[in-house]
Curated annotation (Swiss-Prot):
Residues the entry annotates as binding Zn(2+): C303, C305, C308, H334
Chain residues that bind substrate: D90, S91, G92, G93, F94, D144, Q188, G215
Entry GO MF terms: metal ion binding; tRNA-guanosine(34) queuine transglycosylase activity
Protein's name in the database: Queuine tRNA-ribosyltransferase
Top-level EC class as recorded in UniProt: transferase
Cofactor(s) this protein requires: Zn(2+)
Catalytic activity: 7-aminomethyl-7-carbaguanine + guanosine(34) in tRNA = 7-aminomethyl-7-carbaguanosine(34) in tRNA + guanine
Top-level taxon: Bacteria
Listed NCBIfam families: Q_tRNA_tgt, tgt_general
Cofactor note: Binds 1 zinc ion per subunit.
Role noted for this protein: Catalyzes the base-exchange of a guanine (G) residue with the queuine precursor 7-aminomethyl-7-deazaguanine (PreQ1) at position 34 (anticodon wobble position) in tRNAs with GU(N) anticodons (tRNA-Asp, -Asn, -His and -Tyr). Catalysis occurs through a double-displacement mechanism. The nucleophile active site attacks the C1' of nucleotide 34 to detach the guanine base from the RNA, forming a covalent enzyme-RNA intermediate. The proton acceptor active site deprotonates the incoming PreQ1, allowing a nucleophilic attack on the C1' of the ribose to form the product.
Subunit structure as annotated in this protein's UniProt entry: Homodimer. Within each dimer, one monomer is responsible for RNA recognition and catalysis, while the other monomer binds to the replacement base PreQ1.
RNA binding as annotated region, ranges: 246-252, 270-274
Amino acid sequence: MLKFTLHKKDGLARRGTLELNHGKIETPVFMPVGTYGSVKAMNPQNLHDIKAQIILGNTYHLWLRPGLEVIGQFGGLHGFIGWDKPILTDSGGFQVFSLSDMRKLTEEGCTFKSPINGDKLFLSPEISMKIQTVLNSDIAMQLDECTPGEATREQARKSLQMSLRWAERSKKAFEDLKNPNALFGIVQGAMYEDLREESLRGLEQFDFPGLAVGGLSVGEPKPEMYRMLRAVGPILPEHKPHYLMGVGTPEDLVYGVAHGIDMFDCVMPTRNARNGWLFTRFGDLKIKNAKHKLDKRPIDESCTCYACQNFSRAYLHHLHRTGEILGAQLNTIHNLHFYQVIMAEMREAVEQGKFADWQARFHENRARGTD
């Protein structure tokens, strides 16, 4: 089930509501990444506290460990991990295609060696849909070929055409399995504007309830990613949710919303938190730096997260330096809270028709830097 309601537009920025089997989501939305069924350093209560509306699970990793037999015993991923709100799962394709020296790609699918035990495995659109059906994610993704950013035009066209054939197979398998959830298609085309449009037009025939933009944030220069967003954002169908996969920095989220994107996911806030890199309204802060050793201030005095309301930079500096697990947890709570606040502020700005003003203030504040 998926129902998308577009409430308001301000330029290309959109304010909507997405209704799924496990709940309602206000968009634009950021989805914390729970690769193995957990958002690193966070438990479900932490996620509720920061007002996370939906999380992402990784089909490939969950298929390998703990496997479908285990997760199936719990009725799906929600029951297994103790999370009662919506979940989106990727198709597993990105991870498989990352194993370039361990896989063989054909029209049927991809054969690869398990990086865990060396077993020979095969992933096809049909198998990806079966896995995601067992996971019972609210939003599943079609299996696509993840086109590298540096692909030639001919390589990119050949790749997107196979992804379109896989989109058709994914949709048929999804329907044959009587999956009650939603399946998104994925727009590919590398760094070629006309190929992106060709991919989008090809997907129209399958009438997916939502569309994702894939193949960005895969190593291409930032201006190239933004160029593709400027090209693709305005031509995505207005009545469907738009998902930008694997992006990104706070600035990327704002740029994406400004160009019509509704949904984002990225490991950046959690990964950076574990490395002591914290996001704030006034730029980024490296908590491991010696200047924070005696600093009694919170990470961000304007922040209402648990870490900022209760602990000093000095304590967080100490936790990071000593490798304490609590440090990673508090840093992650802060970074994910910051991302959720950005999204909430953008939703409000679009509602009020003041997105451009909010965007200008956001960039001005971020450029100011922390002290």
